[in-house]
Structures are given as structure tokens and as C-alpha cells.
């Protein structure tokens, strides 16, 4: 059996985190649901760029959408778990000397107590 066998889903998940724009989208979606238009205004990017990143994030299982009229609202998928992953990444980045706020809720106590910023 190949050493990489079965790692495809994990690689797809981490691919979702591998781009600064996708991280910015995730960070903004952590504040609640948003339409593509709202994300483009917040990020200052073209609609096609944001839509492409949302498609990637949806393919990775990190975001979900629901139709509202002619638009779609995007939100984090598996929200509590995704907040935990982002908070853990913040702690790891802090330990390595590269503190970054990835999740607006990182100061919110999780199952293991308060998250470190």
C-alpha cells in the first residue's frame, strides 16, 4: 500500500487553507452568513475571483451555501469544528512566532478551555 493512500481527503482539506484569500473568506464567514456580493465588497476582489475561491472551499467541505432568492448565502460548514481548527492554527502560529488571527471567535472558550490568541 502506498504511503499516501487514503490521504486525498486530508490533502483537499488543507488545500482549502493554503491560500490567503481563502483564509480571508473563512475568517469573514466566521462572523456569519454572507452573499458573494458582500464578500467581494469586504475583500475588494472581483466576483469571479471570490466565486472561484468559494467553489474551492465548498469542494474541500469547508463552506456550504443555501439559495436565497436569486443569490446564495455562504456559511462555514461544520462550524464548531472549523472554529477549533482555526483556533489551533492560531496557537501553532503563535508558538512559531507568527501570530495571526484566523478566527474572530478564537478567544471563545472551547471544549479544552479558553483558546490562546
Which sequence ranges carry the predicted segments?
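A generic structural-conservation signal
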Residues: 38, 66-67, 102
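Alpha-helical residues within the helix-turn-helix
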Residues: 41, 52, 58-59
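Beta-hairpin "wing" of winged helix-turn-helix
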Residues: 58-69, 75
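N-terminal helix-turn-helix DNA-binding core of bacterial DNA-binding proteins
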Residues: 8-49, 70-81
Amino acid at each position: 500500500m502506498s504511503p499516501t493512500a487514503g490521504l486525498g481527503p486530508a490533502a483537499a482539506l488543507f488545500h482549502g487553507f493554503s491560500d490567503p484569500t481563502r483564509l480571508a473568506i473563512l475568517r469573514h464567514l466566521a462572523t456569519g452568513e454572507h452573499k458573494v456580493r458582500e464578500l467581494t465588497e469586504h475583500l475588494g476582489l472581483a466576483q469571479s475571483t471570490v466565486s472561484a475561491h468559494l467553489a474551492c472551499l465548498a469542494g474541500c467541505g469547508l463552506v456550504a451555501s443555501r439559495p436565497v432568492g436569486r443569490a446564495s448565502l455562504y456559511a462555514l460548514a461544520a462550524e464548531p469544528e472549523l472554529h477549533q481548527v482555526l483556533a489551533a492554527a492560531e496557537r501553532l502560529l503563535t508558538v512559531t512566532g507568527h501570530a495571526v488571527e484566523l478566527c474572530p471567535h478564537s478567544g471563545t472558550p472551547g471544549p479544552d478551555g479558553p483558546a490562546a490568541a
